[in-house]
Design a protein with these regions (language model features):
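N-terminal amphipathic/basic leader segments beginning at the initiator methionine
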Residues: 1-9
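Conserved small/polar residues in nucleotide/adenosyl-binding loops
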Residues: 161-162
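Short, surface-exposed connector motifs at secondary-structure boundaries
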Residues: 12, 34-39, 107-108, 153
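N-terminal glycine-rich anion-binding loops that anchor highly charged ligand groups
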Residues: 2, 17-42, 51, 63-71
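Glycine-rich, N-terminal phosphate-binding loop and its surrounding beta-alpha-beta segment
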Residues: 42-113
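Hydrophobic alpha-helical hairpins/lids featuring a short glycine-rich hinge
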Residues: 81-152
C-alpha cells in the first residue's frame, strides 16, 4: 500500500467540511423505501438528481422534503409500484429504485432509465443480480415488468464476476 507522508513545521489541526456526494446520496434515498418511518439524510448535495429522486419517492407515496442540505423521507405504505417514464428519464441512475420497490411491494413496473434500450449497459447488472435473488422480468413495449412472487432472498455473494 502506498502512503503520503507530509513533513512540515506546523502541526495540522482544525475541521474541514466535505460536501455530500450524489453517488452516495441516491442509493441511500432509494434504500429509504425499505425503512418504515422517517429517514433523515444530512449533508446531502442540492443537485438535480437528488430532486428527481425525491419526485420518484413522492410518486411512490412517500413524503420527501428538502431543506438546505437535509433530505427527510417519510415512508408509510407505498401507494404505487409503477414509476412513470417521465420520472425514469430524469436521471440515468433511476434504476436504483427497482430493487427497493421490488423488495417492498413484490412488483415494480418502469421504463428504462433515460429511455435507453435493453442492451449491454449497467442496467443488465441490476437485472442479473435481482434475478439471482428471485426476481422475474418481462418486457412489454419498452416497459419492464418485474415481480418477486416469493419475495427477494439472499443469493450468497453476488459479484460482478458472477454476472454475464
Amino acid at each position: 500500500m502506498q502512503k503520503l507522508v507530509i513533513e512540515g513545521g506546523k502541526p495540522l489541526e482544525g475541521e474541514i467540511f466535505l460536501h455530500g456526494a450524489k453517488n452516495s446520496a441516491l442509493p441511500i434515498l432509494a434504500g429509504t423505501l425499505l425503512c418504515d418511518g422517517e429517514t433523515v439524510l444530512e449533508n446531502c448535495p442540492r443537485l438535480t438528481d437528488v430532486f428527481a429522486a425525491c419526485r420518484i419517492l413522492t410518486h411512490l407515496g412517500c413524503r420527501c422534503t428538502v431543506q438546505e442540505h437535509t433530505v427527510t423521507v417519510q415512508v408509510r405504505d407505498l401507494c404505487a409500484d409503477t414509476i412513470p417514464e417521465v420520472l425514469m428519464q430524469e436521471m440515468r441512475s433511476s434504476i436504483i429504485f427497482l430493487g427497493a420497490v421490488l423488495g417492498r411491494s413484490g412488483s415494480c413496473h418502469l421504463s428504462y432509465p433515460g429511455g435507453c434500450e435493453l442492451g449491454p449497459r449497467p442496467i443488465d447488472m441490476h437485472l442479473d443480480a435481482l434475478r439471482q435473488m428471485g426476481a422475474h422480468f418481462s418486457v412489454h413495449g419498452g416497459q419492464l415488468d418485474c415481480t418477486a412472487p416469493e419475495g427477494l432472498h439472499g443469493a450468497g455473494t453476488v459479484s460482478y464476476t458472477h454476472l454475464r
